[in-house]
Amino acid sequence: MKTLKKQGGFTLVEIAIVLVIVGLLLAGVLKGQELIENSKIKNIAKDMDAVSASILSYRDRYRSLPADETGSTIVLYGWAANVGGGNNNGLIGAASVDPFGVVAGENVNAFRALRYAGFIGGNPADAAAAARPAHAAGGNMALGNTLWGLSGNVVCLNNLTGKFAGALDRLIDDGVNNTGIVRSATVAPAAAAAPAAGAYLEATTGYFLCKQL
């Protein structure tokens, strides 16, 4: 007479315990991702503030905005002459021009001047697009003026998701994309007028954001 063998397997209680553990692990991963994203957003905001503070400190020391000086003035500091060439008008670059589309002149040389002066890190020899500092979301920072309804000089970011752009706007300003000191859109900042009103679509990529200095 054959003896029936007891088949091994998981009980419902064991399966339930495993599912609970998996759920807790997933929740931990998601929470970790959220913390990382929040950290990046805060770091980007701090970097924008740091650029603003650096420009003010530069102006206090040199009585001019970075790269707004003439080349003959720049060489008196012992820096490369091509870091200068500005027009001393108190503005960085040409008005209402996409700062990410400019690879020469005050827009990019301002960062080189800040590096020569020791206000920000990086190699002052880096020129053109390479002069723009990177930000924590994988894009770059740029400087311009009179953009998106913001008068005077502005610092801008590219390559943001709607989630990051919206979070930055709410952290720094009013959370509305076309009002306040922060403006944002999925088109490059290349106009004096404010961008069209629109919601921050969190899953959408390619946002630009500018903050008045």
Question: What residue ranges belong to the model's regions?
Answer:
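N-terminal leader/signal peptides at the extreme start of proteins
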Residues: 1-10
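Aliphatic-rich helix starts adjacent to a transmembrane/signal segment
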Residues: 29-50
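Low-complexity, acidic interaction segments enriched in glycine
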Residues: 68-213
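Alpha-helix exit/C-cap motif
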Residues: 49, 53-73, 120-121
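Alpha-helical hydrophobic helix detector
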Residues: 16-30
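Conserved structured core elements
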Residues: 15, 19, 42-45, 108
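Short glycine/serine/threonine-biased micro-segments
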Residues: 7, 21, 61
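Alpha-helical membrane-interface segments at transmembrane helix boundaries
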Residues: 12-13, 33
